[in-house]
Amino acid sequence: MRIGILTAGGDAPGMNAVIRAVVRSAEREGHEVIGIKRGYKGLIEGDFIKLTSRDVGGILDRGGTILLSSRDPRYKKLEYREKAYKNLNEQGIEALIILGGEGTLAGAKLTAEETGIPVIGVPCTIDNDVGGTEYCIGYDTALRNAVDAIDKIRDTASSHERIFIVEVMGRNRGFIAVEAGLATGAELILIPEERFPREQIPEEIEKAKKLGKLHFIIVLAEGYCRAKELEDFLLEKIGDKYGEIRSTVLGHIQRGGIPTHFDRIMGTKFGVVAYESLIAGERSGFVAYEKGKFYIEDFEKAQEYKPIDREAYKLNTRLAI
């Protein structure tokens, strides 16, 4: 079998572990893997490269993706998808493994339906917001990066008795904010799912100061509001009454760096399951992980709402005294 593999959308640490596992599993059993560079863009433009076990040597500890990635809105148009399908046919690709988040998996579903070839997705996103699976590749590393940064910010916030707003990724969901906030002892976590009233934030700061706290850390998911917006609001409401107010956006630092051991191991397991499911005859779906078990889930599930750990959120509120 000739298997195509691509990574699309935002990169996630651990993608290389998935690629390595697929290539080596396939080669061991006499199958061939063709890398498609820059995601759906490469599929449209015919940017293909043969991958061997040597090509994927020494990549487990590398962040990002050796296949490169992009977001290409052209793939939403049938004329460009037909061009991509023509390229697949000319390359003799009989099956696809597609790595990415919700949007990428929606494209994978469409590809499976329109081409009839087997397509298996692997959920890879630092936001951890793909429905139908407990875990998405890249989340653990992003969480580590956020925690490391917030720990460092607390050092300087403490030294200068400041109020710090730290914005983390999470356009629609607060997974990183909740766990990073709990792990670093944030005084307040703000996420789109809970919508803590903005007007009450000055009260929380005042309450903390009365309890003897010398500094105050707010971990803010970008989907709640932007850090500068909240900084301006607090400056208007309380000024520097309780200490200087500063904001920091962690941004893409959360995406990069050496993948954690967990993302390397999970990436390897996700990759092997994706490959084995193709060989076993699966035609369409993505690799899901739930309660210690891997299985193939319907693509539709990827778009379903995935709840955050509200117990963790409430626990942080209880302990932030």
Swiss-Prot record:
Chain positions recorded as ATP binding sites: 10, 71-72, 101-104
Enzyme Commission number(s) of this protein: 2.7.1.11
Pathway: Carbohydrate degradation; glycolysis; D-glyceraldehyde 3-phosphate and glycerone phosphate from D-glucose: step 3/4
Pfam families documented for this protein: PFK
Binding residue positions for substrate: 125-127, 162, 169-171, 222, 246, 252-255
A GO CC annotation given for this chain: 6-phosphofructokinase complex
Keyword entries, A-Z: Allosteric enzyme, ATP-binding, Cytoplasm, Glycolysis, Kinase, Magnesium, Metal-binding, Nucleotide-binding, Transferase
Protein residues bound to ADP: 20-24, 154, 185-187, 213-215
Record flagged with keyword rRNA-binding: no
Molecular function terms, GO-annotated: 6-phosphofructokinase activity; ATP binding; fructose-6-phosphate binding; metal ion binding
Name under which the protein is recorded: ATP-dependent 6-phosphofructokinase
Provenance organism: Aquifex aeolicus (strain VF5)
Lineage: Bacteria, Pseudomonadati, Aquificota, Aquificia, Aquificales
